[in-house]
Amino acid sequence: MTSPSAPLTGSIVALVTPMHDDGSVDYPALRKLIDWHIAEGTDCIGVVGTTGESPTVNVEEHCEIIRVSVEQAAKRVPIMAGCGANSTAEAIELARFAKKVGADSQLQVVPYYNKPTQEGQYRHFKAIAEAVGDLPMVLYNVPGRSVADMQHETVLRLTQVPGIVGIKEATGNIERAQWLIRDVPKGFAVYSGDDPTAVALMLCGGQGNISVTANVAPRLMHELCVAALAGDTRRAMEIQFRLMPVHKQLFVEANPIPVKWAVQRMGLCGGALRLPMTPLSQGNEAVVEAALRAAGLL
């Protein structure tokens, strides 16, 4: 489901990073997860993003996760490498590495904590694009986590920068997404970063969904995206209604706490997290399990 003018369309899993109980990255489990997603129909695998615990892996680990993912995917599906940082220099370093090892695109989040102005955001992303060259960049706007919010006008400025090909819009605000879809130039992709509103965004003209739920329901999310992108509202909403409890309960605590518990419960990989993330509370384990069962995933 690729396009010459954008990295991809369809279901992009925001993949968890498997870890051993001691907190070290479980690379064999990562390889198995990638194989499973390919078999289940995931259109693209996004690694080392928010769901992949990017804030708590060091640069060496970050690079190794990208390298292993690219190697294991072996061009069977594209790899979208999370390369975001609140230091422009570090983001460039990560993106250069991703390009060197063969990633298909990079995801660059709005710098968090240091709260750059709109001009600072523009210069940050422009500097990365100019430094890294032809590795397609997808912007990532998630003000609920980064605090800084990339405004509509800033996105439009960035659409004119060579190499910036899309945006993951994770506000869940469909009106805002519609304005973006209306105003961005042809060939610039708008992706949902919010599972509950992903169908609506795609039916409005968005190109896909960068999904947490796809960690536990990859085939269903792929089918949902196929239907929504084809304008088949009935089929898309049939799947969406089935997955709504999962969308909701995977955020009953901060992501990726619930989804890490869910993938362990499903036997896909271990559920260990790195501090300051802590395990899902016992009470919420039952809530997440009920959602998985309601969707037929257990």
Curated annotation (Swiss-Prot):
Pathway stated in the Swiss-Prot or TrEMBL entry: Amino-acid biosynthesis; L-lysine biosynthesis via DAP pathway; (S)-tetrahydrodipicolinate from L-aspartate: step 3/4
Main localization, broad class: cytoplasm
Active-site annotation: 140, 168
EC supergroup of this enzyme: lyase
Reactions that this protein is recorded to catalyse: L-aspartate 4-semialdehyde + pyruvate = (2S,4S)-4-hydroxy-2,3,4,5-tetrahydrodipicolinate + H2O + H(+)
SUPFAM superfamilies: Aldolase
Residues the entry annotates as binding pyruvate: 51, 210
EC code(s) of this entry: 4.3.3.7
UniProt record, GO biological process: diaminopimelate biosynthetic process; lysine biosynthetic process via diaminopimelate
Function: Catalyzes the condensation of (S)-aspartate-beta-semialdehyde [(S)-ASA] and pyruvate to 4-hydroxy-tetrahydrodipicolinate (HTPA).
Family according to the record: Belongs to the DapA family.
Protein name: 4-hydroxy-tetrahydrodipicolinate synthase
Species in which this protein is naturally found: Acidovorax ebreus (strain TPSY)
Gene: dapA
